[in-house]
Amino acid sequence: MIVKSLDDIIGTDDETSSDNWTSRRFIMKKDNVGFSLNDTLIKAGTTNFFWYKNHIEAVYCIEGEGEIEKLETGEIYKLKAGTMYLLNEHDKHELRAKTQMRMVCVFNPPLVGTETHTEEGYYPLLTE
């Protein structure tokens, strides 16, 4: 059994940040469960381009407001606490945070934990 609190992660190597977001990595590849789980903060007023060409991501918004645009179609979906989206087609998308957003994110294959986005908006597929 694995039990962790957010306090166990903040300020450690399991917390990764960029200018627009901070991701606290609860479950990673080393845990050998087939997925990873992050608690991610998206900064208010930011626009973020992402394209997870190597991963499937499910996201559940638990705080804040914003929107996500599926770039291939121009479809825009409002996001608020209680909204989930699944990037099951490796969708290129833009995430716009109106307020700070807190998201619970599940990745498959699992993240190693040190990933940051490339210039093309995706996480490299790391093995260690």
UniProtKB/Swiss-Prot annotation:
Keywords: Lyase. Its EC number is 4.2.1.108. InterPro entries: Ectoine_synth, RmlC-like_jellyroll, RmlC_Cupin_sf. Pathway: Amine and polyamine biosynthesis; ectoine biosynthesis; L-ectoine from L-aspartate 4-semialdehyde: step 3/3. SUPFAM superfamilies: RmlC-like cupins. Pfam families: Ectoine_synth (PF06339). One of its GO terms (molecular function) is ectoine synthase activity. Gene3D superfamilies: Jelly Rolls. It catalyses: (2S)-4-acetamido-2-aminobutanoate = L-ectoine + H2O. One of its GO terms (biological process) is ectoine biosynthetic process. Catalyzes the circularization of gamma-N-acetyl-alpha,gamma-diaminobutyric acid (ADABA) to ectoine (1,4,5,6-tetrahydro-2-methyl-4-pyrimidine carboxylic acid), which is an excellent osmoprotectant. Belongs to the ectoine synthase family. This is L-ectoine synthase. The gene is ectC.
